[in-house]
């Protein structure tokens, strides 16, 4: 590899690296000073990357709860059928700072089993 080619490659890699670093949304958008716990029936569940999600209606409000990635869910014993629509669960989490219908979930209790997601 010539010096010019190497410099070009390194410049390209450096230019693309910040995009990869911010591609994941992170958890900074959730207010950890306002934790809550709710119990309800799962209306819909999504078991795919980047994060699994469940939707529930609590006291007339429709919520979207962001869970862990599928690989972590599987390692902790939470399979798609465990969080399927129609199941009842309890979640503990933090509300999103700008989306009032979304929350990040720290742990879920389903089928009598408490599972830490972070």
Mark where each language-model region is.
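N-terminal export leaders
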Residues: 6-10
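Short boundary/loop segments of OB/S1/cold-shock single-stranded nucleic-acid-binding domains
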Residues: 22-34
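Conserved hydrophobic positions within beta-strands
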Residues: 40-42
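Short aromatic-glycine-enriched beta-strand elements
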Residues: 49-56
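Short nucleic-acid-contacting surface segments enriched for D/E, G, S/T with interspersed K/R
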Residues: 75-90
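OB-fold/S1-family single-stranded nucleic acid-binding modules
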Residues: 97-118
């Amino acid at each position: 590899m010539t010096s010019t080619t190497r410099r070009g490659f390194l410049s390209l890699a450096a230019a693309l690296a910040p995009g990869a670093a911010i591609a994941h949304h992170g958890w900074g958008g959730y207010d950890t000073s306002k934790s809550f716990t709710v119990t309800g029936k799962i209306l819909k569940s999504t078991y795919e990357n980047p994060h699994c999600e469940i939707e529930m209606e609590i006291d007339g409000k429709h919520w979207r709860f962001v869970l862990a990635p599928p690989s972590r869910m599987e390692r902790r014993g939470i399979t798609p059928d465990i969080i399927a629509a129609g199941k009842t669960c309890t979640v503990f989490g933090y509300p999103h700072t700008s989306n009032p219908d979304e929350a990040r979930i720290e742990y879920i209790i389903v089928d009598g089993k408490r599972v830490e997601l972070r």
